[in-house]
């Protein structure tokens, strides 16, 4: 049986006592080594949930357990040792004068010796394809390059869990593809548990499992293919449909009957080729 690396039980968070809760009675588990996507429209509460997992926002009710440690004010730093987090805007995360200084920052905070720090920084930059930018100022980089540097900083400290909080939302399509490809590779190499907070349904397709948050509540949980088959239900919650589902809808409008189950881009391409060859 797969071990749960995170357990969230009846979590509620309220920014102000005069406001409705941003999260209400949310419970779920995260399996060690899995990729979990948490999707929802803007303002649904998904980023509040992400920040609650490592104590950035102290929840009002409920409990969070990470790696067997229950999150409390006394244990928050033990929990954070296990988690690396990348946010939407990489500029808000940079503290170093150069790329390599920034990647080294987390190691310096952990009082890692320079003899150990230098090779770890070099290895982290190599893993994200940023070795040649080590001496550059972070401000001179593109958005995609900045997120790679932020990811290198996480790789260097070697956490068990990586949280991407809308980390690809400010990237162009190619930058998004490249970033997710690097995350997939790192996950395999380091047995990372990945939690992706996103409103991008195509990004959620990379996950093993998807949670849907709507108005602060967990309203659905399933594998991506089952979630994407919800169709109009996703649209009603302010989410987009995956490209392949849009394509299937367009085919139906033209009198063509596509597969009824969710198809990845590769599967849809194969189906189209077979359909064309049979006509």
From Swiss-Prot:
Origin species: Levilactobacillus brevis (strain ATCC 367 / BCRC 12310 / CIP 105137 / JCM 1170 / LMG 11437 / NCIMB 947 / NCTC 947)
PROSITE patterns with a match to the protein in the record: ABC_TRANSPORTER_1, ABC_TRANSPORTER_2, CBIO
Binding positions for ATP per the UniProt entry: 40-47
Gene Ontology molecular-function annotations: ATP binding; ATP hydrolysis activity; ATPase-coupled transmembrane transporter activity
SMART domains for this protein: AAA
Membrane topology field: Peripheral membrane protein
UniProt main location, coarse: membrane
Gene Ontology CC: ATP-binding cassette (ABC) transporter complex
Function, as annotated: ATP-binding (A) component of a common energy-coupling factor (ECF) ABC-transporter complex. Unlike classic ABC transporters this ECF transporter provides the energy necessary to transport a number of different substrates.
EC number: 7.-.-.-
Entry protein name: Energy-coupling factor transporter ATP-binding protein EcfA1
Keywords in alphabetical order: ATP-binding, Cell membrane, Membrane, Nucleotide-binding, Translocase, Transport
Record-stated family: Belongs to the ABC transporter superfamily. Energy-coupling factor EcfA family.
Subunit structure: Forms a stable energy-coupling factor (ECF) transporter complex composed of 2 membrane-embedded substrate-binding proteins (S component), 2 ATP-binding proteins (A component) and 2 transmembrane proteins (T component).
């Amino acid at each position: 049986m797969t071990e749960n690396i995170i357990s969230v039980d009846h979590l509620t968070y309220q920014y102000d006592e005069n406001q409705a809760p941003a999260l209400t009675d949310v419970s779920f588990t995260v399996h060690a080594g899995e990729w979990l996507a948490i999707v929802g429209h803007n303002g649904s509460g998904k980023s509040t949930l992400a920040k609650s997992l490592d104590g950035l926002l102290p929840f009002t009710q409920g409990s969070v357990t990470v790696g067997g440690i229950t999150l409390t004010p006394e244990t928050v730093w033990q929990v954070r040792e296990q988690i690396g987090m990348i946010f939407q805007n990489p500029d808000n995360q940079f503290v170093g004068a150069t790329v390599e200084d920034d990647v080294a920052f987390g190691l310096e905070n952990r009082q890692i010796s320079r003899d150990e720090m230098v090779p770890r920084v070099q290895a982290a930059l190599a893993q994200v394809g940023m070795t040649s930018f080590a001496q550059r100022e972070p401000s001179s980089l593109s958005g995609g390059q900045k997120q790679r540097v932020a990811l290198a900083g996480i790789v260097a400290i070697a956490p068990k869990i990586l949280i991407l909080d809308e980390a690809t939302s400010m990237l162009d399509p190619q930058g998004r593809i490249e970033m997710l490809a690097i995350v997939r590779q790192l996950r395999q190499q380091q047995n990372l548990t990945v939690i992706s907070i996103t409103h991008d349904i195509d990004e959620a397709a990379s996950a093993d499992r998807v949670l849907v948050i709507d108005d602060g509540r967990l309203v659905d949980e399933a594998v991506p293919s089952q979630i994407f088959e919800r169709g109009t239900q996703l649209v009603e919650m302010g989410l987009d449909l995956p490209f392949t589902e849009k394509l299937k809808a367009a085919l139906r409008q033209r009198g063509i009957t596509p597969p009824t189950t969710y198809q990845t881009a590769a599967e849809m391409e194969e189906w189209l080729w077979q359909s064309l060859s049979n006509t």
